[in-house]
Amino acid sequence: MGELKKIDRKVNVCVIGGGLAGTFAAVAAARHGARVALMQDRPVLGGNSSSEIRMWVSGAGSRVRNLQETGIMEEVLLENMYRNPTRNFSIWDSILYEKVHAEKNIELLLNCACCFADCEGNKIKSVTGFQLTTYTWQKVEADIFIDCSGDSILAELVDAEYMVGREAKSTFGEEFGLPEADKKTMGMSLMIQAHETDHKVDFIAPDWAYKFTTDEEMKFKPHECLDKINTNFYWIELGGEADSIHDTEEVRDELLKVAYGVWDHMKNHGEHGADNWELDFIGFLPGKRESRRYVGDYIMTQQDVETGRQFPDEVAYGGWQIDNHLPGGFAMSGKGEGHLQKKRLREPYGIPLRSLYSKNVENLMFAGRNISASHIAFSTVRVMGTCGVMGQAAGTAAALAVHYGMSARQLGKEKITELQNILMEDDCFLPGLRRKISPLCTADTLSAEWGDPSALINGIDRKIWGNDNGYWGMVDRHITYTFKEKTHISDFRLIVDSDLDREYTEGNPDVLNISNTLFRKLSYNYTTFGFPKCMLKSFRIEALDDNGEWKTVYETDKNHQRMIREKLDVDTTAIRLIPLGTYFSESLWNTYGSAQAHIFSFEVR
C-alpha cells in the first residue's frame, strides 16, 4: 500500500482557521516576531466575509457611534475602501491574501483541513491537516495553537472542554436563559446578492426549489427589492434545530431550496419591485453563526455584556447588540423579526484574555465565534468585527507568551499590562484604558504653530464618550517636539481620523455608520463607493539638522491608512509634522474643502 506525501513544519504559533479572527491572529503574531502557520480549509481567507459566503462585517461600531473596531480590522477595511470602490469580492479576498503573504513569518496552508492532533499530557504537540489541492498531509508542531475554526475542530481532537446549545436560566442567572437547557443553536444562512438593471430580467427557478406562491407564505420576511436594497437575506436561516456541524450538508441543501424559492417569489409571484433586478450570487457554503464554544478560565455572560463590564485582563471589546437568532429561523412565523431575541447595549464591554484560552489544555487559545461565553453573551461577541479584534488580541498574546516562554494563563497573570500596551500601540481600542505615551513626547516638548496639541498625547486615539480626543490643525502648520539635547529618533507613530462612523465617505447613500457598505452590490444607477474625505492624505516629517535647517525625513501624498508607523534613523534636537492635505483635496495642497487635519496621535521614539 502506498502513502500520501507528508510535510513536517515547526513554528511558534499555529492558527487553525482563516476567517477574520484567524487571519488577524496570524498577522498579529507574525508582526510580533513569532513564526506562524495558518491552516485554512478553504481556498480563500475571510470566512463568512469571503467571496464564498459574502456576509458583511458588523461590530460594535454598527450599533454604537465611535466604536468601530480599529487595529488590523480598520487597516483591511480602509485598504478595501481605497482599492475596491465597486466592492468586488475577489478584490476583498486578494486584500486578505496579501496581508498574510506580506508577513514573511507566516506559512499559509490554504485548502488544508485539520484532521488529527497529537498531545502530551495537557499540551498539544502537533496538528495534522490534509491539503486537498496537493494531496499532502501537513503536520505542524507549535508552542501555542489558536483555534479560530469557528466549529472548534480541536475541541474533540484534544479533549478540550466545550459547550453546545442554550443554557438554562439557572446556569448563569441570565434574563434570556431557558427554563431548561437544550442543544439547539443559532442557524446558518446562504446569502443572496442581486443588483438593479435598467431593463426587465426574467428568472426561471429550478424545479427543486421550494415554491412560495403567495405573499402570506412570505409574511413578515423583508423581500421588497427597492425598499430593502441593503439586505443580504440573512434571514434565510436554518439549522439551529439540527447539529450545526455534522448536519451542515443537509442544512445546505434545504437552504438552497429556500433561497431559490425566495428569489422566485420575488420575481414571479406578486409585485415586489423586482422586475429589473438580476441575481448575482446565491452561496453554496452556509455562513454559520454558532456551533461549539470552548470553556476558558472565564465564561462571559449576559450580565457582563449588558453592564459594559471591564476586566483587569481586557484585551478586546464588543458592542453589537444581544442578537440571539432563535433555532427555528426561516421556519418560524411571527411579526417582523420574530425569530430574533434582541437587546441593545448602551456601552462597549470588555473581553478578557481568560475567555480566549482553554481551561484544561495548557497551550490552546481561541478567537472568533468559539470563545468562552454563554449562548446569550455569544450572541453579541460572534459578529466579525468583534471576532477580528479578538483574533488580533489572541495572536499578539500568543507571540508575547512565546517570547517569555510562558502559557497564555501565565501571561495574563504576569504580563497583562505589557500585552494591553502593545495592543493599544497597535491601534486596538480597550475601553477604560489609556495607551502609554513615548517618554520623548511630553507637554514640555510638544508645541504647535496653530491650536492646542495636548490631545495628541492623552493616550486615547478616537472620539469616545463625548470627547473628541483629537487635535484639529490647520494644513501647512507644524506640530513640533523640541528636545533639550540631540536625541535619536527611531520611528514615528501617527493616528489620523479615518471617519470611523463613515459619515464623510462618498458613495454611502444611506450614511451608514457601519461597515455593511463594504459588501453591497452596486446597481446601475449608483456611483461607486468613496473613501473617507476627512483622512489625512499628504504630510511631511522634518527634523532639524546641525545647521539649524529643517530636512525632510519622511513624506507621502498617498496615505490611506488611519495608523502610520514608520522607521526613522535621525539624531536631532527637534522634529515636526506638517499636515499638507486631506482627501477633501484634489491636489497635494489642501486647496478647498477641509482646511484642517484631524489627528489623534503623533509620537516619536
Short names for language-model regions:
Residues 8, 135-139, 550:
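Short, mixed charged/polar active-site loops
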Residues 7-19:
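Beta1/beta-strand and adjacent pyrophosphate-binding region of the FAD-binding site
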Residues 2, 10, 28-35, 40-123, ...:
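Conserved N-terminal/central alpha/beta ligand/cofactor-binding core
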Residues 462-605:
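Aromatic, loop-rich ligand-recognition surfaces of beta-strand-rich domains
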Residues 437-460:
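Predominantly extracellular/luminal regions of secreted and cell-surface proteins
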Residues 48, 111, 123-126, 133-442:
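Flavin (FAD/FMN)-binding glycine-rich loop and adjacent Rossmann-like elements that form
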